[in-house]
C-alpha cells in the first residue's frame, strides 16, 4: 500500500477511535485534527468534513455486513447457514467493535440524505439476512420487516454484550447462536426449522 494510502487509513482509524471514545458530537474539528496528527486547516485536505468521515465509517460497516451474507452457503441447510452467518458476524464484531458502536450511537449525527443511504443499506441487509436464514417464514409485511430488524439487531449487538463475559469464547458464541436460533424459531413461524 502506498504511504499516502497508509497514512489516510491510519488517520481514519485514529478518528474512529476518538469518535467511539467521546461520541461524534463531542469531538471538535480542532481536537480531531490534533488527534490524527494534522493541523485544523489541513484536515480538510484529507477529509471533506467530519460528517463525511463518520458516514464513510458507517457505510463501510454496512458493506462488510452485506458481505457476511454472501450466497456461497446457500446450498447448505438453514441451520448451517445460520451458524455461518452468526460466526461471520461474531468475527466482524471482533474486528470492528468501534464501528458497530458508531453505527448504533452516532447514526443520528449524519445528514438526512446520509441517514437515508444507510437506512437503505440496512434494509437491504435485513432482507438478505432473512432470505438466507428463514426463507420459508409465514410472516409477511410489517411483521416480517419487524422480525428482520430484531434479528439483525441481535446479530449486531450480542457480540458486544457478551464480550465482557468470563465465559470462554466458544461458550459465548454458542450462547449467541442458541439465543438467535430460539428467537428465529419462535419469532418466524416455519422459518429456520423447516427451511432447507
Where do the PLM segments sit?
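Helix-turn-helix
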Residues: 6, 10, 14, 18-52, ...
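Amphipathic alpha-helical packing segments from all-alpha helical-bundle domains
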Residues: 63-66, 92, 112-138, 145-149, ...
Amino acid at each position: 500500500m502506498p504511504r499516502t494510502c497508509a497514512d489516510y487509513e491510519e488517520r481514519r482509524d485514529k478518528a474512529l477511535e476518538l469518535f467511539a471514545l467521546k461520541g461524534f458530537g463531542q469531538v471538535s474539528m480542532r481536537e480531531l485534527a490534533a488527534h490524527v496528527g494534522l493541523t485544523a486547516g489541513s484536515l480538510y485536505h484529507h477529509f471533506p468534513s467530519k460528517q463525511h468521515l463518520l458516514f464513510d465509517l458507517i457505510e463501510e460497516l454496512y458493506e462488510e455486513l452485506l458481505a457476511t451474507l454472501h450466497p456461497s452457503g446457500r446450498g447448505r441447510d438453514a441451520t448451517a447457514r445460520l451458524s455461518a452467518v452468526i460466526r461471520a458476524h461474531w468475527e466482524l464484531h471482533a474486528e470492528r467493535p468501534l464501528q458497530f458502536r458508531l453505527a448504533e450511537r452516532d447514526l443520528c449525527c449524519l445528514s438526512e440524505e446520509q441517514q437515508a443511504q444507510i437506512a437503505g443499506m440496512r434494509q437491504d441487509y435485513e432482507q438478505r439476512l432473512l432470505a438466507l436464514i428463514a426463507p420459508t417464514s409465514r410472516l409477511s409485511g410489517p411483521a416480517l420487516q419487524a422480525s428482520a430488524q430484531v434479528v439483525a439487531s441481535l446479530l449486531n449487538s450480542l457480540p458486544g454484550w457478551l464480550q465482557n463475559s468470563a465465559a470462554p469464547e466458544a461458550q459465548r458464541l454458542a450462547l449467541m447462536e442458541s439465543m438467535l436460533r430460539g428467537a428465529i424459531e419462535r419469532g418466524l413461524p416455519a422459518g429456520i426449522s423447516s427451511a432447507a
